[in-house]
């Protein structure tokens, strides 16, 4: 029983990735674990096409400024 419990604890730690890694959207539903030093998620407008804004998403150390941009620091906050 102790072996099973220890195994579950180890698997949980590995699956949770306790390294405080931030995860951001990069395109549509695609997600990326941000590298060290990039502790923000952002979504920023790069222009328009056929009357709709075109956005880029990803990890950042600093965010682009703009009225339609999103800059946040929790997992998957840049949808």
UniProtKB/Swiss-Prot annotation:
Tissues with expression: Expressed by the venom gland.
Disulphide bonds in the chain: 24-41, 34-59, 63-71, 72-77
Localization: Secreted
Signal found in the keyword field: yes
CC per GO annotation: extracellular region
Matches recorded under CDD domains: TFP_snake_toxin
Molecular function terms from GO: toxin activity
Stretch forming the signal peptide: 1-21
Pfam families associated with the record: Toxin_cobra-type (PF21947)
Keywords, in A-Z order: Disulfide bond, Secreted, Signal, Toxin
Keyword Transmembrane helix: no
Record family assignment: Belongs to the three-finger toxin family. Short-chain subfamily.
Note: This toxin has not been detected in venom.
Protein name: Three-finger toxin A2
Organism expressing this protein natively: Micrurus laticollaris
